[in-house]
Swiss-Prot record:
Domain KH type-2 residues, every copy: 39-110
Region (Disordered): 216-243
KW Ribosomal protein (keyword) present: yes
Domain of life according to the entry: Bacteria
Functional summary from the UniProt entry: Binds the lower part of the 30S subunit head. Binds mRNA in the 70S ribosome, positioning it for translation.
Pfam (any one): KH_2
SMART domains: KH (SM00322)
Record GO terms (molecular function): mRNA binding; rRNA binding; structural constituent of ribosome
Quaternary data: Part of the 30S ribosomal subunit. Forms a tight complex with proteins S10 and S14.
Annotated PROSITE patterns: KH_TYPE_2, RIBOSOMAL_S3
Protein name listed in UniProt: Small ribosomal subunit protein uS3
Amino acid sequence: MGHKIHPNGLRLGITQEHRSRWYASSKTYPLLLQEDDRIRVFIQKKYGAAGISDVLIARKADQLEVELKTARPGVIVGRQGSGIEELRSGIQKTIGDRSRQVRINVVEIERVDADAHLLAEYIAQQLEKRVAFRRTIRMAVQRAQRAGVLGLKIQVGGRLNGAEIARSEWTREGRVPLHTLRAEIDYANKTANTTYGVLGIKVWVFKGEVLSKEEQPLPVGASPRRKGNRRPQQFEDRSNDGK
């Protein structure tokens, strides 16, 4: 099952969070879902050069919150925050409601080369520049390894290097445990429009396992807590004694 299902959808609520966080009735749900899609398409088209990895949308009453995870926040923010106002007005125009309160939060990605979306975008850009796909994959693997990822898998499919018959090739470095639900797997897919046709790109990045509090490793020199038969605590109300 881990190889058949979407890695992010399988881990929602475990290691992945929902990209849209809001509740709605059955009548308004389709409308709000279409709004979210229009907002994401607008942001990706307008700020494609900003290296946007993800767009999270939350709704609270009449307020709309949009969080952008990007590698270059300065492209979005602009000088003295002028870009934020431009983005806010663009979102209001996209959803067709100028009076809607829109709150924008821009988050900078710390490890750019460990992000699956940005790696897939980098591979797509190189393939569109007619760089050999094996060299492109090797360069992407080296960048991810320098970023400290524990595992990486890259798959490219289509008319590779202009071949007459389409095929798929993939490479893997390290561990990519798709069956482990607590494994933090970052997944992304992109398309590259080349002169020979469309190439599909898939990237899996393994960043580690999310452990519960009981499974957290102990500090150096700390002894494990004994699990003996503890006497249960009892609390008695003696406020009325002696009366």
